Swiss-Prot record:
Keyword Ribonucleoprotein carried by entry: yes
Transmembrane segments: none
Crosslink feature (Glycyl lysine isopeptide (Lys-Gly) (interchain with G-Cter in SUMO2)) location: K61, K63, K106
Protein name: Small ribosomal subunit protein uS11
Main function: Component of the small ribosomal subunit. The ribosome is a large ribonucleoprotein complex responsible for the synthesis of proteins in the cell. Part of the small subunit (SSU) processome, first precursor of the small eukaryotic ribosomal subunit. During the assembly of the SSU processome in the nucleolus, many ribosome biogenesis factors, an RNA chaperone and ribosomal proteins associate with the nascent pre-rRNA and work in concert to generate RNA folding, modifications, rearrangements and cleavage as well as targeted degradation of pre-ribosomal RNA by the RNA exosome.
Biased composition (Basic residues): 142-151
Cross-referenced NCBIfam families: PRK09607.1 (NF007176)
Amino acid sequence: MAPRKGKDKKEEQVISLGPQVAEGENVFGVCHIFASFNDTFVHVTDLSGKETICRVTGGMKVKADRDESSPYAAMLAAQDVAQRCKELGITALHIKLRATGGNRTKTPGPGAQSALRALARSGMKIGRIEDVTPIPSDSTRRKGGRRGRRL
C-alpha cells in the first residue's frame, strides 16, 4: 500500500513546565510541613504562598490510620513532593514547620523531622527553616474540664 499524501510528521517541541532560569540558578518554593500527632502534611507553594504546587499527606501513602503520622509515611510524602517539584523546575525550598499549636500542643509530631530529612536527601536545596506554629498571647480555655482528662 502506498504512503498517504499530505500527512507530514510534525516535530514535537520540548515544553518546560517550570520557570525559565539560567543554568545553576536556584528556583525557590515554600514547603509548609504541618506535623500533628494524627497526620503529616507536606505542602509546596510558590513564594507568595497562594499557588499550590504539590500537596501530599502521610495518610495518602499508607493504608492503616494509625500510621498516618509515622516518620515513614512522612518520608514517603516528602519524597513524592520532591520528585514533583523537580519535574516542575523547583530546585530549592524554604521550610515552614508547624505543629498543631493554639491551645493544643506546640511540639511538632513525629513526622516533622523525617519529612525535612527526606526533602534534603532527595536533592532539594534547603533555604530557610522557620517554625510557624500558632502561639496564642492569651488562649481560650483548653478542653478537658476543671479536673482535666482522667486516664
